[in-house]
Amino acid sequence: MQATLIKPTIFTHQPILEKLFKSQSMTQEESXQLFAAIV
């Protein structure tokens, strides 16, 4: 995932992004939700 894509929404979705970057063990469903939230 590109950081440039996330930057604009990093503060809005900080909890989800923290989970993504710290654990890096998201399920496919969580990944889809994160993608939908950003886009």
Swiss-Prot record:
GO BP annotation list: L-tryptophan biosynthetic process
Superkingdom of origin: Bacteria
Keyword annotations from UniProtKB, A to Z: Amino-acid biosynthesis, Aromatic amino acid biosynthesis, Glycosyltransferase, Magnesium, Metal-binding, Transferase, Tryptophan biosynthesis
Protein EC: 2.4.2.18
Key word Oxidoreductase present: no
Pathway: Amino-acid biosynthesis; L-tryptophan biosynthesis; L-tryptophan from chorismate: step 2/5
Database matches in Gene3D superfamilies: Transferase, Pyrimidine Nucleoside Phosphorylase, Chain C (1.20.970.10)
Known catalytic reactions: N-(5-phospho-beta-D-ribosyl)anthranilate + diphosphate = 5-phospho-alpha-D-ribose 1-diphosphate + anthranilate
Annotated GO MF terms: anthranilate phosphoribosyltransferase activity; metal ion binding
Keyword Transport found: no
Family to which this protein belongs: Belongs to the anthranilate phosphoribosyltransferase family.
Record note on quaternary structure: Homodimer.
Function: Catalyzes the transfer of the phosphoribosyl group of 5-phosphorylribose-1-pyrophosphate (PRPP) to anthranilate to yield N-(5'-phosphoribosyl)-anthranilate (PRA).
Protein name, entry field: Anthranilate phosphoribosyltransferase
Annotated organism of origin: Pectobacterium carotovorum
